Amino acid sequence: MRPRKDILVSGCFIVVTSLLVMAIWWAWRQYVTDPPYVDPEQFPVRGIDVSSHNGMMNLDAAARDGVEFIWIKASEGADFRDANFALNYQKAQHAGLKTGAYHFFRFNRGGVEQALNLLRVVSGRRLELGIAVDVEEHGNPRTDSVLQRLQTMTEYLNLRGYRVTFYTNKDGYAKYLSEYFRGFPMWICSFTDDSVGDDWAFWQYDHHAKVKGIQGDVDMNAFCGSREQWDSLWRRPVPGVAYPLRPEK
């Protein structure tokens, strides 16, 4: 017969192990969430967003797989530049994808210095989708400071002919953008529903999509408009920078 102490230790080990397995499963479910159903009739135009983390890509194959547009990471903060931007941009243009560049906004750096960092990467390039500023909550910055820096960066880009789209999730939208940046096209990350807002231009609905020509997972997005609205954008003159992409409702 096993000693009572050994039985208690074994029982505690089983309980702790079970709790640990449950915690890991719960955390995994929070991270790997089944994407919402995206009605292809309501959202017929799909695209991806990429960075150097996606590695080497065959964007011609991605285009044949139904991808029609791409957002490419260009820069972050005041001094980081994505090492693969130039190559990814070249591949996107060769594949015929409508292309935009995005900048990850750092709350602790000034708006002008971040705009300058971005422009050093994208200047002279044709960007049909224009520029997106990625606003994601991190740290605990003062809201008024964030808004001031965002406004400074946006105005700096606007004065140089660039129309800005904002990327964020619903929390970031409510905290920073909904009141102070009305009228700007929004690119919203949401994995829960398709309740598209009136100012949504793009909807990121999946972080784990599979696309031919890309190894591993890739972010998938939908244009928040009809096929006709999408096609009508490209009948306008494209100046090499951006113009409003939010579809008319």
Q: Where do the model's predicted regions map?
A:
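Short beta-strand/turn micro-motifs composed of small residues
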Residues: 103, 168, 190
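Hydrophobic membrane-insertion alpha-helices, especially the h-region
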Residues: 9-29
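Aromatic-lined carbohydrate-recognition surfaces of secreted/lumenal glycan-active proteins
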Residues: 161-174
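N-terminal Lys/Arg-rich, disordered targeting/topogenic segments
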Residues: 1-7
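Functionally critical loop-and-helix segments that line ligand-binding/catalytic clefts
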Residues: 35-55, 181-249
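Structural recognition of alpha->loop->beta junctions
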Residues: 119-133, 176-199
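Substrate-binding cleft of extracellular glycoside hydrolase catalytic domains
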Residues: 30-35, 40-63, 74-154, 158-163
